[in-house]
Amino acid sequence: MALQLDLPTLHDLRVVLNADFLAALAALLLLAVILVPLCSYISLYAWSAILAFKLRSPPANWEKSIVKGVQANGTSTLFGFGFWQAAAVRRQLILQSNDPSYYSVTHVSRRSEIAISPEDRNTEFRNRAQDSGAPRRVIYGFFHPYANAGGGGERVLWAAVKDTLMYDDNIICAIYCGEQDLPTRTSPSTVLDAAVSNFHVTELADKELRKRIVFIGMRGRRLVDPKTWPRFTLMMQAAGSVWMAWHGISTLVPDVFVDTMGYPFAYPLVSWVTHVPVAAYVHYPVISKDMLATVSLKQSPVRAALAVAKLVYWRVFALTYTFAGSYCSVVMTNSSWTNNHMQHMWWYNHKAEHIKIVYPPCGTQALSEIAMSEETSARSPNIVYIAQFRPEKRHDIVLREFNKFYKEYTEKYPNQPAPHLTFVGTVRNDDDKSRVYLLRLQARDLVNPDSVSFVLDAPFDKVRDILRTASMGVNAMWNEHFGIVVVEYMSAGLIPVVHNSGGPKCDIVVPYEGQSTGNSGTLSAMPSSTSIRSHYEAVPPGPTGFHFNCPGSDPTTDSGPSYDGEPIGTLAETLMRAFELSESDTHNMRARARESVKKRFSNEQFGSHWQVRMRILEKLEQIRRGHRLTRGDFD
C-alpha cells in the first residue's frame, strides 16, 4: 500500500503565515505601548534633572566674578555667563544681596548680563556670601502675568505678597509678570506705587520691604491673551502659559511657586524642572461642569456633530486640567462656588477637604469708616457699577436694564430726584477703549443720555468718594467667581443688587443672622443665636441685598423663588423694588450688609488664613530641599 503524505496546501501556508504575522504585529504594538511611555518618562525625567541642575548650579568661578564685581568702582556688570549660568548666578546674588530688588529683570534687561548693586559693594555682602551660618533666605515666586492690571486678582496678589514678606524677614518675593509691565528699570517702583494707590496696601510703600520684592519680566504674554487665539482658545492659552512659566523659571528658580492668576497647565513643568512645592489661589476654574452642561446635542445633524466634537474636546481638556492640578500641593479657592467646582475637577491626587476656601482681601476697614449718618442723609440716587471693561462683565445689559428702570421710575415718581448710573473701571488696552466707546454710543440712545457717566482709571480715594454718596451697587456678571467689588459696596453702605449666581449669591449677599436675602421691601425677622445677636445687637436680622436674573442672556438660570415666594426679577424690576424701600428699611439693610462682610472679608482675615498656608508651604519647602540635597543638587 502506497504511503500518502498530507502536504500543506498553499492556502494552509497563507493561513499560518498570516497568523504568525498578526501575532508578531501584536507583539510589536504591545512592546511599543510599553516602551514609548517608558522611554518618554525616562527622557523627561533625565531632561528635567539636567535642567534643574543647570538652572541652580552656578559656574565654578562665580564667587570670584562676584567679588571682582563688588570691588570694582562704579556700576559693574558680570559678563561671560551663558543662559543657564546667568540664572544660577542671579539666584545666588538675590539670596545674598542687601537689595535683592536691584536684580529685577525688566524689558530692557539682558538676561545673560548681571549688574552688581551699589549697595552690595561692601564687606557685609562678601561676608554674607561666605557665612554658612547666616539665616537661609527663601524665594517665593508669584506667577501673575498681568500684575499691573488693577483688578480683583491683583488685589489678592499684592495682599499675598505683603503677608508673605511680613511672615519672615528672610523671605524674598519674586513677581513673574509680563515684561510689558516693566518697560524701564524704574517700572517695579511704578507697579508697587499703583498697588498702594489702587488697593490701599500701604505696607508696600515701605522702602525696606520693597528691597525684598524682585520682578521677573516674562516674554510671550500675548500667548495667554484670548484674543490671540480665536480657535482652540483654551488649549492655546494653556500652551502659552507653559511657555511663559518656562521663561520665568529659566530666569530665576524660586523655592516655592505660587500661582495667583490661574494657569495650572504650567504646574507639571514647574514641578519637573524646579522640584519645588506649587501653591495655587484659584479665582475660577479654567473649565467647569457648567461649561460642559451648556453643550446641547439636540440640534441639526451638522450642528450636533460639531457639538459632539466640541464636547469631546472639552472633556479631554478637562482630564488634562485634572492632571495638571495634581501637581499643586496647596490649593486655595476664593468662594464656595469656585471651591465646589475645583473639588469636582481636581479629584486626582487631592482630597476634597484639602481644597479650602480663603476669601480674598476686600479692604473692608477703609470703606466701613464712612459714617452711618452719611448713609441716610448724603446719599444720592446714584447706581454704581465697578468692573473692568471686559465682555463678561456685561455692561451693555446693565445699560439696557437701567434705561427701562429709569423710564419707569421717573414716570412713577416725577417729583423725586432722577436716578443716575456711574460706570467705574480700569482701561487696560485698546479693546477696553473700544468697549467704552461703544458703551458711550449706546448711552446716547437712552431716555436721558445725561443719566450715565463713566469714571476711568480712578485711584482708590476717588472710588471711595463715589461709594460714599451712592445708593446702590450693581454686579451683572454671570457666575462671578467671587465678587470683591460687591463686598466693597456693602462695606461702604451701599445696597448690593447682584446677579443670581456664583460668589455674590452663595457667599456675599446672603442671609444675615439666618434671614433669606430679600427681593422685596418686606423685612421679616427670624430667630437667631444669642451670641451673634449680642455682637450685633444694634443691627436687626434680615436681608442684605437683592438678586436678579437676565432672561435670554444667562447661559443657565436659577429660576427658584425669592424670599417672599415671588420669582426673581430682571435688573430693572429689582432696581425698582430696591428704590421703593422705606427709609428705615433701607437703613437697616445697609447696616446688615456692612456688618455681614466686615469680619468675613477683611484684609486681616485673609492674612490669618494666608499665614496658615505659609506654614504648610514652609514645611513642604524644607522637605523638597532635603530631597534635592540628597540627590546632590546645588542649593
From Swiss-Prot:
One of its GO terms (cellular component) is endoplasmic reticulum membrane. It comes from Yarrowia lipolytica (strain CLIB 122 / E 150) (Yeast). Residues 43-231, 253-481, 503-635 are cytoplasmic. Pathway: Protein modification; protein glycosylation. The gene is ALG11. Residues 232-252, 482-502 dip into the membrane without crossing it. It is an enzyme of class 2 (transferase). Its EC number is 2.4.1.131. InterPro entries: ALG11, ALG11_N, Glyco_trans_1. Keywords: Endoplasmic reticulum, Glycosyltransferase, Membrane, Transferase, Transmembrane, Transmembrane helix. The chain crosses the membrane at residues 22-42. It is a single-pass membrane protein. Belongs to the glycosyltransferase group 1 family. GO terms for molecular function: GDP-Man:Man3GlcNAc2-PP-Dol alpha-1,2-mannosyltransferase activity. The lineage of its organism: Eukaryota, Fungi, Dikarya, Ascomycota, Saccharomycotina. Residues 1-21 are lumenal. GO terms for biological process: dolichol-linked oligosaccharide biosynthetic process. It is found in: Endoplasmic reticulum membrane. Its main location: endoplasmic reticulum. GDP-Man:Man(3)GlcNAc(2)-PP-Dol alpha-1,2-mannosyltransferase that operates in the biosynthetic pathway of dolichol-linked oligosaccharides, the glycan precursors employed in protein asparagine (N)-glycosylation. The assembly of dolichol-linked oligosaccharides begins on the cytosolic side of the endoplasmic reticulum membrane and finishes in its lumen. The sequential addition of sugars to dolichol pyrophosphate produces dolichol-linked oligosaccharides containing fourteen sugars, including two GlcNAcs, nine mannoses and three glucoses. It catalyses: an alpha-D-Man-(1->3)-[alpha-D-Man-(1->6)]-beta-D-Man-(1->4)-beta-D-GlcNAc-(1->4)-alpha-D-GlcNAc-diphospho-di-trans,poly-cis-dolichol + 2 GDP-alpha-D-mannose = an alpha-D-Man-(1->2)-alpha-D-Man-(1->2)-alpha-D-Man-(1->3)-[alpha-D-Man-(1->6)]-beta-D-Man-(1->4)-beta-D-GlcNAc-(1->4)-alpha-D-GlcNAc-diphospho-di-trans,poly-cis-dolichol + 2 GDP + 2 H(+). This is GDP-Man:Man(3)GlcNAc(2)-PP-Dol alpha-1,2-mannosyltransferase.
